[in-house]
């Protein structure tokens, strides 16, 4: 396992990320530090990055360099926001950085920015057609794609920071918000293709301003799980947030407590941009992505087949989780046994194919709770799944999988706990969780020694008895003995006796 450092010089902050990655292309962020440095402040006045900002940047980079050296991290990716390309002293600035800390930064081109965002979405969303909207500090990018092909793209030279600065003299908050929306709308209307989108194009919001807005939406609706990626910001929910922001005292010295460390006036301008998007792209919701430029650049650096769209996004993210937090068992074998049982018991559980993805997540992470404690690891697994980066699945599927893992132990099912998630889960889901929980538990018991002794299972139903016949390649007496411990749970859930041979 190797380590990689990624440093981004943004328009308003410098981000240092430390990642772990493996030779087979899995990576995860181990540490991330963000420090506010407004590099582009007053840049439009004379075209120069100010010396005080340069000194502040280099002082910070010296610290990051020491951190890298202390851990022996030699591999790094260093890049700067394209907006810095407008600075007259950009080359002198980057040259001074290299001479001082031996870090070679390059300013991303718009093409590289588009490529990174496109690749990040291909690796974290299963959508065939998408519209990526990224809001930065001093710019925004909009990209339309169909699979691996970018169809249209545009760069708008206003982001949340410089939009807030443009209208800082407007004192009435409601009037200011409406003026910002009108201004961004005028920019969007210069791109005719934005108004010719097909209905099945999914809108994906990227960046800290979408994340802050998503956090506001989740808090306002008391959304029961705190997962940002793939969260849907609905038009209806967003309208209430926009209306609320217009009534607040928005000041650049203030912050929205519990929402973001960003200045409140900048969050408000970001929300104004999103309002303009909702007004013009005619979409009922925008899906939030936590995988932006950095994710795409790292994927391009590490993954040998980054040119190709990832065909199995969910499989990749589950494999990555198990790669960095191994359980000591072959999780693929447990999943294979779960699928066999799911098919063989179909006449009993009567669940459709929509539950297969839930089964895949829960079977792949059924032992994940042991990272916290072996005692009631099934219940611990609930929180582990909700805290893991799982891509290619909806919040409903992830939450269902968490409940399935917890309900490997049937005593863990609590109706009062279940009711907390009623806005995401349906009435029929409780029964499905109990059935899938038993299937996953049975699969883990049939692989209890980790020797992959059980290769196949056939099912016969004779009256009130279900007979599971195992096909084995070695001694599986312990596996069968352990599997017999769930006979009473099987009877309770499926209403039939179970025999395992």
Task: Give names to the regions the model predicted.
Residues 1-5, 9-15, 19-80, 91-105:
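N-terminal glycine/serine-rich phosphate-binding loop of ATP-dependent small-molecule kinases
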Residues 14, 26-27, 140, 150, ...:
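Hydrophobic residues embedded in beta-strands of well-ordered beta-sheets
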Residues 476-497:
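Short, non-transmembrane amphipathic alpha-helical segments
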């Amino acid at each position: 396992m190797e380590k990689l450092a990624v440093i981004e010089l943004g328009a308003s902050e410098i981000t240092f990320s430390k990642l772990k990655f493996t030779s087979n292309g899995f990576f995860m962020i181990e540490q991330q530090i963000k420090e506010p440095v407004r590099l582009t402040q007053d840049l439009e006045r004379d075209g120069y990055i100010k010396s005080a900002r340069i000194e502040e940047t280099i002082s910070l980079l010296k610290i990051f360099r020491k951190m890298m050296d202390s851990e022996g991290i030699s591999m790094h990716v260093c890049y700067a926001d394209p907006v810095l390309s407008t600075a007259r002293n950009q080359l002198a600035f980057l040259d001074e950085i290299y001479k001082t800390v031996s870090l070679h930064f390059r300013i991303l081109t718009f093409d590289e920015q588009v490529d990174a965002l496109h690749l990040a979405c291909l690796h974290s969303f299963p959508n065939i057609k998408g519209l990526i909207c990224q809001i930065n500090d001093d710019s925004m990018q909009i990209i339309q794609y169909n699979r691996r092909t970018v169809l249209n793209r545009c760069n708008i030279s206003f982001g949340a920071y410089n939009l807030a600065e443009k209208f800082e003299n407007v004192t009435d908050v409601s009037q200011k918000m409406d003026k910002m929306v009108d201004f961004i709308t005028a920019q969007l209307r210069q791109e005719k293709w934005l108004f010719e989108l097909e209905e099945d194009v999914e809108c994906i919001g990227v960046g800290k301003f979408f994340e802050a807005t998503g956090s506001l939406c989740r808090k306002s609706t008391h959304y029961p799980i705190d997962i940002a990626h793939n969260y849907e910001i609905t038009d209806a929910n967003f309208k209430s947030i926009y209306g609320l922001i217009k009534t607040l005292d928005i000041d650049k010295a203030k912050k929205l407590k519990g929402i973001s460390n960003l200045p409140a006036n900048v969050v408000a301008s970001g929300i104004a941009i999103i309002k303009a998007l909702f007004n013009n792209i005619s979409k009922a919701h925008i899906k939030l992505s936590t995988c932006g430029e950095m994710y795409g650049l790292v994927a391009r650096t590490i993954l040998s087949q980054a040119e190709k769209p990832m065909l199995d996004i969910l499989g990749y993210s589950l494999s990555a989780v198990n790669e960095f937090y191994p359980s000591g068992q072959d999780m693929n074998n447990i999943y294979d046994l779960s699928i066999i049982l799911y098919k063989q018991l179909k006449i009993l559980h009567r669940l459709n194919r929509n539950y297969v993805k839930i089964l895949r997540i829960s079977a792949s992470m059924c032992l994940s709770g042991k990272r916290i404690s072996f005692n009631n690891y099934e219940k611990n697994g609930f929180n582990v799944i909700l805290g893991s980066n799982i891509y290619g699945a909806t919040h409903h599927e992830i939450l269902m999988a968490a409940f399935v893992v917890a309900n490997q132990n049937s005593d863990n099912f609590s109706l009062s706990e279940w009711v907390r998630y009623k806005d995401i889960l349906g009435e029929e889901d409780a029964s499905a969780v109990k059935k899938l929980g038993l299937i996953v538990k049975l699969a883990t018991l049939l692989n209890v020694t980790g020797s992959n002794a059980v290769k196949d299972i056939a099912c016969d139903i004779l009256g009130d008895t279900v007979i599971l016949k195992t096909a084995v390649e070695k001694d599986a007496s312990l596996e069968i003995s352990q599997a017999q411990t769930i006979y009473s749970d099987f009877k309770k859930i499926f209403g039939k006796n179970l025999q395992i041979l």
